UniProtKB/Swiss-Prot annotation:
It comes from the Bacteria. GO terms for biological process: photosynthesis. PS I from Synechocystis PCC 6803 contains seven different polypeptides. The polypeptide corresponding to subunit II from higher plants is missing. This is Photosystem I reaction center subunit II. The keyword Transmembrane does not apply. Residues 111-141 are annotated as: Disordered. It holds the Pfam family PsaD. Belongs to the PsaD family. SUPFAM superfamilies: Photosystem I subunit PsaD. PsaD can form complexes with ferredoxin and ferredoxin-oxidoreductase in photosystem I (PS I) reaction center. GO terms for cellular component: photosystem I; photosystem I reaction center; plasma membrane. Keywords: Photosynthesis, Photosystem I. The keyword ATP-binding does not apply.
Length: 141
């Protein structure tokens, strides 16, 4: 079983009761490492101060963790690239969720197959009128 470590950020507000329900069902944890204390926007509203070193924050929804992760990767200097998202069950079991194979989805990973790509430039796309009555779907052409 994975043991999560880190200090919670300094936050003077509340989560609006969202974590009380999450304690009965499931909650999500995001961990990251920061080189310095910095102010960041909480996905639940308000601002908090992240600690220098390891940080651990519990949130009620995975989308909130993903939003905070995007903020960590884009708004800070140096960029914080090492965040991880976990699902925490009421039993204490921890499941690692994101990034699933260790590389963020928009990055190229050795062995990751490209999905829905066409090996042509946009100017080489067929004319829509030639596809319309051909019996083929646009994604098949």
């Amino acid at each position: 079983m994975t043991e999560l470590s880190g200090q919670p950020p300094k936050f003077g507000g509340s989560t609006g009761g969202l974590l009380s329900k999450a304690n009965r069902e499931e909650k999500y944890a995001i961990t990251w490492t920061s080189a310095s204390e910095q102010v960041f926007e909480m996905p639940t509203g308000g601002a908090a101060i992240m600690n220098e070193g390891e940080n651990l924050l519990y949130l009620a929804r995975k989308e909130q963790c993903l939003a905070l992760g995007t903020q960590l990767r884009t708004k800070f200097k140096p960029k914080i690239q090492d965040y991880k998202i976990y699902r925490v069950y009421p039993s204490g079991e921890v499941q690692y969720l994101h990034p699933a194979d260790g590389v963020f989805p928009e990055k190229v990973n050795e062995g990751r197959e490209a999905q829905g790509t066409k090996t042509r430039r946009i100017g080489q796309n067929p004319e829509p009128v030639t596809i319309k009555f051909s019996g083929k779907a646009p994604y098949e052409v």
